[in-house]
Regions:
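Gly/Ser-rich, low-complexity
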Residues: 1-72, 87-97, 107-177, 216-221, ...
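Sec-exported extracytoplasmic/periplasmic mature domains
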Residues: 83-86, 105-108, 199
Length: 288
């Protein structure tokens, strides 16, 4: 009878061991792929990230948004002229130099909305250069290997069925968690670029407000927001570099599950840090 029970126990152990190894095998591949590609993705200019999408955004901005910006600029220029006249006693004390100042301000505003995309790309050229230079300094291996799985497999057959079943539940939860985290990393990195495209699509409207002192804060805040989006890539690289250092501190021992849980915790920390990069960049540059 004991032989039969032992055979059943060994059979259950083999099933649980195979299931655990299946859950843990290639566990970190999705995360490795997403984290490994972060430096390349955040270092790519908006025009190169997805050229067809960028061409569509540029066409919409020039053909749909730019005429609206022209109307706003016309209103602002007329408002400035009327305000200038009324402030000088209906031209009784009007100086000719003031009209030249108005013409100069209006011409600069027209030039800015006409060359909006050149200005926007110059902003991202500066920030992407910072990201490119920092990626050469910030280094570290972020690839997570299947830690001690062969050692874990040999030790599992020595465990009882109860603890082995608990280990199976842990491995199942870890597998789901790591896949969710890989999706979260993908969403954060690609979501930043989509946010850039959305900001660029409406660029002519805030750029049209620079000619008026009362409304220029719209354009100033917009420009700060663009710099924040650009430097967010730099903060993302810093998060990945910290993640790489933390991974190197994970102790590889016979207790592979604890090591894996440590890596899961660090990956969750990475996702949380990536979420915070946007708010940190905006708070530093005073954008809202």
């Amino acid at each position: 009878m004991e032989t039969v029970l032992k055979a059943i126990s060994d059979w259950i152990k083999s099933l649980l061991t195979a299931a655990i190894m299946s859950n843990l095998s290639g566990l970190f591949e999705d995360v490795n792929t997403q984290v490994g590609g972060i430096a390349q993705q955040v270092g790519t200019k908006p025009s190169s990230f997805e050229p067809r999408v960028f061409a569509m955004i540029e066409a919409l901005s020039r053909n749909v948004v730019l005429p609206i910006a022209g109307v706003i600029l016309t209103f602002i220029a007329c408002y400035e002229l009327i305000q200038m006249i009324t402030q000088h006693n209906n031209m009784a004390q009007f100086e000719p130099a003031l009209i030249l100042k108005w013409i100069f301000k209006t011409a600069i505003s027209v030039w800015m909305i006409s060359n909006t995309f050149d200005i926007i790309m110059a902003v991202f050229d500066v920030t992407q250069q910072v990201v490119a230079n920092s990626s050469g300094i910030i280094s570290g291996n972020t690839r997570v290997n299947d830690i001690g799985l062969s050692m874990l497999q040999s030790s599992m057959m020595q465990m009882d069925v109860g603890p082995l079943f608990g280990l199976f539940l842990q491995s199942f939860f870890i597998g789901i968690t790591m896949r969710i985290l890989s999706i979260v990393i993908f969403v954060i990195v690609y979501g930043r670029m989509i946010e850039i495209y959305m900001a660029v699509s409406l660029a002519p409207i805030p750029m049209a407000t620079w000619g008026n002192h009362e409304q220029s804060h719209v354009g100033q805040n917009y420009l700060r927001s663009l710099f924040a989006l650009g430097f967010q890539g730099f903060l993302i690289l810093i998060c990945v570099a910290i993640y790489a250092v933390l991974l190197q501190n994970v102790a590889i021992s016979g207790d592979a599950i604890n090591s894996i849980w440590s890596i899961v915790g660090y990956t969750i920390l990475l996702c949380f840090s990536l979420f915070k990069t946007s708010s940190v960049a905006k708070s530093i540059l005073g954008a809202h």
